[in-house]
Structures are given as structure tokens and as C-alpha cells.
Amino acid sequence: MSGIQFDVSRLCAATISIQGRHFVDSHGRVLHLRGANVSAASKVPATPAPKIHDHAQASYVGRPFRLEEADEHWARLKSWGLTFVRITVTWEALEHKERGVYDEDYLAYLRALLQSMEPYGLVAYIALHQDVWSRYCGGSGAPGWTLEAAGFDLSNEGENLSLSGAAFLDGIKSGRLAGERGLWPTGYQKLAAATMNTLFWGGETFAPLLKVPGQIDGKWVSRNIQVYLQEAFLAATAKLVKAVGDLETVMGFELMNEPHPGFIGIQSIHEWDYTTDLHLGQFPSPLQSFSMGAGHPTPNVPVYTRSFPFPTRVTSHVTANPEGACAWASKECPWEKHGVWRWSEAKQEAAALQQDYFVKNRDGGKVDFYEDFYFPFVRKWEQVIGENISSTKGLKARMVEAIPNELCPEWKEESRPKNMVYAPHWYDLNTLFKKKFGFMSVNVQGLARGMFILRALYFGTAAAKANYALQIKTIVLAARLKLGPVPVIFGECGVPMDINNEEAFRTGDWKWQERSMDALISAMEGALMGFNLWTYNPANRDDIGDDWNAENFSWYSESNRTKLLKNAEKSSDGLDVGARLLNVIVRPYPIATAGNPTSLAYDANACAFTYRFRSPLRVSAAAPTPEEYTEIFLPRRVFRKESTEWTVTAGGKVHVDWERERVFVWFEDSSLTAASIKDDTRPRRIDIWVIGRKVEENWSIAQILVAVVILLLGVLVAYYAQLYEWEKDKMIFQHLREANGM
């Protein structure tokens, strides 16, 4: 193809637009966006983090990394083909000191960080990140003053929050977490986070008496806590958009990471939903958490431990908060004030007054989290984004998602933001919960929706791929059915590095992490989904992981890079040093398609890439234009000139640019006329592979025996479950007979 000039794509907000369900470039080609979350380090302040009671002093300047290091990190991500970045920003980073006082140093740092991406052709969207509402609830996100406005006591390093069971705070304190390391998600059901989420979304409905005084236009007024929190959040969003929204490296903003309804929608304050809410450790009911938070020692609080085949089971009951610590600075629980419950001095226990309080509005009608609270706020947020983008040039997408582990809800067009992108998350919940991945994988998504247990078990690597693919396609199909032609991007997906008792740290054998990651990315490819892997965190270390709640997801670590370079027999400054799983993360994919994608697959073992798409046939013998050729990323770490072959559908022309790691493909037949091939977008295919690479998966005898044993256990569980149901039916029938005098 001598003499033909092929342009390499450079992502830029000014040249990306949305057409139906696709992102497209300025040439009308369909973009496949993939990249990383940068980074988990941004969940916590720069070292050293202040004490909880000194939360106003928190600074996030230098998170995720120092500006002088940025060029190397962007170059590394580009070399891996990960050019679509989700930038983690917390509300606390923007406004930690007090309401209305923004950290200008951080905003200047963030702007410079985003500008530094431009020479590398990377593009980003900004995600306002939260987990469990705030660091001061045991997660990340909102500033400490939001909890104080609601009445929580953050004094003395948050001691009363911890002692009263209102929050699990051990995981946000720097260092290796001892004991049970999977407790942080249970924070959503603890008093602090559940209350804050309820107040943020539905304070006017569920806590109308909770007012916050403040000045507006020089006058002191009292506003409902919902209005106070939402106005502050939207003002912080406006500040963020004004600071970076004009940059061509910024192609969008995300409303909120993994929004949660808190208490809204729970059927009874006597229990949480076992099928959707992780029950682990000391796990009080909402009523028990009210009692504990109000400073009462509370008996009969269940303690859950890990089990099989159900994830957890009750193994004991304890008297929680025996010290009588109170989570409220005023010593008054707002839920007691609103008549949800009361403390009985006579019985020395909490009594429910309105057990279904959180499913009704003020008029007694049933509430719906999405329709009544979430969608109205999305519309307010959309207005703020639109009003504060100073430049109309280029795409500013609006990323939104559903409640974690829920499928896309019904979402009317009038409730959707402009340039909407649906951005769900997906993880293998069984691997996350057990910190194990091996011969057997489980479809937790299916189990939560009533799938028979034997259908939810998968054995072997190929089956794990099928498991992941089914779960991803279920999420995508639900979004397609509810939203129609709206782009879908998986904003988070990833694999823990510390699975299987941290064996890989000791042996250097990352095969199980590689298999899980390969299954994950293969599932995304099978569904033609773009994605952001969680997470690229240079601050990661083997001993403390990402230094937040014992999570360890980063496949790159500066600490490991330093060790490897120090111990290397010969000097190496390659960008790959310090990374893991690159054999499955760095893979070919279609960057820009002249036509419509129909299927994508990559076998990381065989190094075999197959891409099918519908593309027009050219009739000109002249050099193809960017509108006419498809551009594929072909990483040189896998595909070498001397060992790579390819085939292409009839009429296909291929140009490989080995230096720039690109394949350009187009289809032509100069013997035809334009009229004869009008609207001809027939299926095309290109296959690229490395000669002689093929690895077969074989089951060992031990693995076969394990599969048989598990299947037998599944049958027994099903049998006894059916016996239990029959016994229940028998008792009901007997009761009916007695009631009718039979």
C-alpha cells in the first residue's frame, strides 16, 4: 500500500458524537471505547489523611498521581490501547472545608491533569464517585459536613459512629485491614449511609421536620435537608463543570457512582432484603440500627458468617452497642422524631410505630425510588450541566446508571438527560465476596433472580466465559429494551488481584486472575460493549492493595515496578514493567469501524482475533478515505510481523502499520458501479492470528470429581428445599382445614 496515507485516530471530545446507540467520530465511523478508571487512589485524601474529626483539612491535590508523573501514565495507557478514561473525583475533593468553599488548588490540579492527556489522544469523562455515601460512613464521596448537617457526631475520630454500629470505619484508615475484609458493602445498610442516602434523595418526603439553617442572599433561612444537600451537590457539580468542561479531553460527566436509595423502598423496618443486600458480620435491622444509633444497647442483633450454598447465615446473636454510644450529636434520632419508632423505657427496647414508613409518601401513596426521587434529580443535574458548559464544541455526554446490581429501570424519554449514556457496572460478585476464582464460577445475578442453583454453576475456563457473557448480555438486553438506541458503556468492571489467599503474590503465577480478566473482557467484546476497567492505580501495593477497605484491583503498581527494576539483571525502562495480566488486557480491537459492528471475539490463548461488521463496498481504485476504512488496534507485544497472518472477506484490502500498531481494512471492487452496489453493506470479516498458537483446556481428574460432588450437593439442596416447601404447604392446608371446621 505504498504511497497511501492512513490517519491514526486520536480521541477528542470535539470529534466524538452520539448517533443512536453508537459513539461515532468525525468521519462517521463507529467507535469502540475502552480504557481504565483512574484511579482508586482518588477515593482517599493525599497522604497523610487527616483524622475524621479534622475532615475539613482533607486535600486531594495529587490524586490520582502527581502532575509530573502524568505523561508516563498516559503514555502507558495509550500503549495498552486503553484510551478512554473514567476519572474519579469525589465531592469531598471539591468542597471539603465547608459548604460553598471549594478547593481551588484541587480544581487547578485537576484541570492540568486533564490537559496533560491531550498529546496522547486520550479522552475522559468525570465521575463524581461515592461508595456508602462518604468516607465518614466507611466509603468515599461526600464531605464530612454533610453528615454533620444531618446531625451525626464525627468527633473523636468518629468513635461514636463506630461504637453505635452506625458505620464501619476501619477500612478507610490507612494500612492493612485485619479481620473480615468484606464488610464495607454492608455499610449501605448501616445507619449513617442509609440515613444520608434517604435524606439526600427523599428528605422532604421522609424527614420534613429536619431543617438546616443557612444564609441565602444575606438572609438566614431554614431549608429541608434534602434541598440543602441537593443544592450543595449541584453547586459543586457546576463548579466542576466550569473548571474543566471546556477541555477537549473531557467528553462527559457522570452523575454519581452507584447511587443507592438508603431506606427508601424497604418493606419493613424489621428487615433488609437478603436477596439484594449483603448480610455479613453484625447486621442489625433498620429498627435495631435506630436503637443502636440512639445510644441504646440493643439485644438480639444477628451476626452473619460466610456459608454455602447460601452466601451467609446467622451463626449468633449479640447485644450490640453495649457501651451505649450515641451516633447523634444532639442525642436525638430524626427517625424517632418523625414517629417511625420509639424507645420503650418500660420494656427497654425499640418499638416500631410505622414499620412500612419508607414505602409511602406524605399522602400515604406508594413511592417509587426512580420515578419519585432519582429521575427528578437527574433532570436538575442535566440542567446544571447544560448551563455551565462554556463551550458547545464537541460531545459532553451524561453518564447515568441504576442502583447497583439492578437491571435498567423503565426510563421515559422526558426523564432522560441530553446525550445520555447508560453506564452500568459489573463484577463477578461470587469472586468479590469469596476472594476466590478457580474451577467453578457462579451466576450470582441469576441466583438473585430465582435461577435454579444447578443452572447457575459453571465449571472450567470456557464455562466461566459463558457465565460472564450471559450476565453481561442480560444487563445490555435490559438496557436495550428499556432505553432503545442509547449508548451503553460499562463504567466499572474488574478483577481483584488478591484472590485465592493472595497466592499470586507469593508465586508470581497470575493464571487465575488472567482467566477471570480474560472471561470478563471476552464477555464485553461478545456484547460489543465499551468499558472502563477498575482500576489503574499506581499507588497500589501488594500488602495494602488500593489502601481502601482492603480492595486490591489495580493491575499496575509503581511499588512493583520499582522492585522489578531494582532486581532486574539488565536495565529496562519499558512501560510494561510493574504491570500484570497484560496478556489478556492488551488485545486487538476495532478502534473505528467504517460500517456497523456485528461481532467481536479474541482468543487470548491462541492470539486469534475475529471481527465481523457490515461495511460498504468501494468502487473507486483511488486511495481510501478515513470514512471508508476500518482501523484496528494490533498490539506489537502480541502480534509480530514475522509470525502474524490474516484473512479477509472477498474484496477486502488490508494495510498493516507495524510501527503504529494498526490494521486498516476496506472493501472495494473497481469493476462495479456505484449504482450497482447502492446500499450494499453486506457482512464483512477479518481474522488475524499468530502462527502456531493454540492452547486447549483440559479438565483434571480432581476437577471432574469436584464438579460431580458440587452437582450432587446441588441436587440435595434442591431436594430438601422442595421438602421444606411441601411441609409448608401441608401446614397451610392443615390450618385451612382447622379454620373451616373440616
UniProtKB/Swiss-Prot annotation:
Top-level EC class: hydrolase
InterPro entries from the UniProt entry: GH5_C, Glyco_hydro_b, Glycoside_hydrolase_SF, Glycosphingolipid_Hydrolases
Membrane topology: Single-pass membrane protein
Entry's pH dependence statement: Optimum pH is 7.
One Pfam family it belongs to: Glyco_hydro_5_C
Protein origin, superkingdom: Eukaryota
Description of the deletion phenotype: Decreases membrane glucosylceramidase activity at neutral pH. Increases cellular glucosylceramide levels; levels of normal glucosylceramide containing mature ceramide and abnormal glucosylceramide containing immature ceramide are both increased. Decreases capsule size during growth in capsule-inducing conditions.
Main location class: membrane
Keywords assigned by UniProt, alphabetized: Glycoprotein, Glycosidase, Hydrolase, Membrane, Transmembrane, Transmembrane helix
Catalytic residues (positions): 258 (proton donor), 492 (nucleophile)
Name the UniProt record assigns to this protein: Glucosylceramidase
Organism: Cryptococcus neoformans var. grubii serotype A (strain H99 / ATCC 208821 / CBS 10515 / FGSC 9487) (Filobasidiella neoformans var. grubii)
Gene: EGC1
